[in-house]
Amino acid sequence: VPEHTSSIAHRLAALRLWFNETRDEADASRLASPPGGAAGALSLLLVAGIALSMTDAVGDASDWTHFARLLSRLGATEAAQSLAGWMREPVEGSNHRLIYWALNCQIWYLAVPLLWATAAARIPLSELGLGVGRLRAHLPAYAFLALLLLPLLLYVSAQPAFLRVYPYFDPLPGAPLWPDFWRLELLYFAQFAAVEFFFRGFLVQGLRSTFGYASIYVSLLPYCMIHFGKPLPEVLASLVAGLVLGHLSLASRSIWPGVVLHIFAAATMDLAVLWRKGLLG
């Protein structure tokens, strides 16, 4: 057998062993969980369902009008009018609406689940992936994914569907990117921390003791659905990303490498698109 063929087979065997160890460990935690865990899982799923529903109902960039109407009904007419003026500002209105969206992500994907987990369910934050876990042992896998993503991101950044969507926040015409655009990008990046916590921490880690390795699959469908409206390749890629990031979250017991990887992908895409549009010079 050629040496390179043997090396590939060895690496594939090591990868299979790593996958099986993570799956078996997650399933062992399910088998070892005390009776009555289903009630806690049901409560967690209910909170997740409310968070997803509210994000869809009032959290999109175009849904600020619901909040404005609520302010009016509460008697805060001037605040509602100020909000409307801010959202409809001719030059920066589109970015203001995206700020509204990003802040809603922080509320529904991060603050509400965290409040329930700490105040009601008494779940340690480390059990939801917010600790360092076994991060160091799995950093090479995340670094490999970043290297794998780089050429793919550079390729799709030239496609018309992605050029229309990205960057999410629009640079002001004729204005330098720093500081205004990059301040908005920081808010955009923070949104990914909330998303990673919700899907890979709250759902995957939070449901590990009830569903075992299948907690990844529980989180996969809603994760794909939040990408609806984006370019089709990105929607389909979210299924692969959900599986891979879910597995790595279970393996490392931490969401933080996934947060960094998500931010790396977003920053690379935005920089590549800005460069292709001639806005980096």
Predicted segment positions?
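N-terminal, membrane-interfacial amphipathic/helix-forming hydrophobic leader that caps
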Residues: 1-124, 273-281
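Transmembrane helix-loop-helix hairpins at the membrane interface
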Residues: 10-14, 51-54, 147-281
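Residue-level signature of transmembrane alpha-helical entry/exit and packing/kink sites
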Residues: 36-45, 98, 102, 106, ...
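Generic structural microfeature
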Residues: 45, 123-126, 134, 202, ...
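Juxtamembrane helix-loop-helix connectors linking adjacent transmembrane helices
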Residues: 67-105, 119-191, 209, 279-281
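Long, contiguous hydrophobic alpha-helical segments, chiefly transmembrane helices and signal peptides
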Residues: 109-110, 128, 223
